[in-house]
Design a protein with these regions (language model features):
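Conserved phosphate-binding catalytic cores of ATP/NTP-utilizing and phosphoryl-transfer enzymes
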Residues: 1-18
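Active-site metal-binding loops of divalent metal-dependent hydrolases
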Residues: 26, 151-153
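Short, acidic/small-residue loops that bind anionic groups at enzyme active sites
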Residues: 1-2, 49-51, 168-171
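A contiguous, well-structured pocket-lining segment that forms one wall/lid of small-molecule binding clefts
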Residues: 77-147, 154-171
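Short glycine-/acidic-enriched loop or helix-start segments at secondary-structure transitions
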Residues: 4, 30-33, 158-160
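Active-site catalytic microenvironments in core metabolic enzymes, especially phosphate/sugar-handling
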Residues: 25, 169-174
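A short helix-loop
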Residues: 14-16, 21-24, 29-114
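Buried hydrophobic packing segments
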Residues: 1-5, 58-61, 135
Length: 174
C-alpha cells in the first residue's frame, strides 16, 4: 500500500482514510486504509471478488483466444479493434463481486464465432464494470475518499482511464 502511494505521488494520503485496490491474478480486493499511531496504517479488506480474480479473467480470456500468458497487454491491444459498446451489469453480492461469469460468457462468445477483438473488449469491460461497482459500493458505505489502484490489471489503460474519469482514482505503476 505504501509503495502504491509512493508510485502515484501521494504519500500524504497516509494521513487520511482512503481505499486501496489491489487488482491482479491473485487478488481483487478493496482495502479501507486508516492512519494508525502504532502501526502507521490499519488496513481492512472491505470488498473482494468471491471467485475468479480480475487477472485470472483477463488471462483466461487471452489464452482462449490464443494469446501467450500473461495476456493483459496483448488482450488490451486486441480489444482496440472493437467498436462494440457492451452493456454490462456486474454480479455483486453485497460489496463483493463475482467474476466467474466473465469466463463463461467469453467461452460462449467464442463458440458463437464472435470476433476476437469483441471478446477481448467484453472481458476488459466486464472487469472494469466490476471494479467500478466495487468502488461505488465501498464509497457508498464509507464515504467519498481517494481510491488508489495497484497490481498488474491496473496497468490496463482502458480500465485506468474509465476509473479515473468516474472516481478521480490514482493508479500505481504495475
Amino acid at each position: 500500500i505504501l509503495a502504491a502511494l509512493y508510485s502515484v505521488g501521494k504519500p500524504e494520503l497516509i494521513n487520511d482514510r482512503f481505499i486501496a485496490f489491489h487488482v491482479s491474478g491473485g487478488t481483487t480486493e478493496a482495502v479501507l486504509v486508516t492512519p494508525d499511531d502504532n502501526d502507521i496504517i490499519k488496513a481492512e479488506v472491505v470488498s473482494e471478488s468471491t471467485d475468479l480474480k480480475a487477472g485470472q479473467a483477463i488471462d483466461r480470456t487471452g489464452v482462449l483466444l490464443g494469446i501467450d500468458f500473461p495476456c493483459g497487454p496483448e488482450l488490451e491491444k486486441l480489444s482496440l479493434g472493437s467498436n462494440e459498446n457492451f452493456k454490462i451489469k456486474p454480479t455483486m453480492i453485497g460489496m463483493n463481486c463475482s467474476l466467474s461469469g466473465i469466463e463463461n460468457k467469453v467461452k460462449k462468445m467464442i463458440s458463437d464465432n464472435c470476433p476476437p477483438y469483441d471478446v477481448a473488449k467484453f472481458a476488459i469491460c466486464s472487469v472494469c464494470e466490476s471494479l467500478s461497482s466495487m468502488a461505488e459500493a465501498v464509497t457508498d458505505k464509507y464515504g467519498n475518499m481517494p481510491l488508489v489502484f495497484a497490481g498488474g490489471v491496473s496497468g490496463n489503460k482502458m480500465i485506468a482511464q474509465t476509473l479515473k474519469n468516474r472516481f478521480g482514482a490514482y493508479f500505481a505503476e504495475p
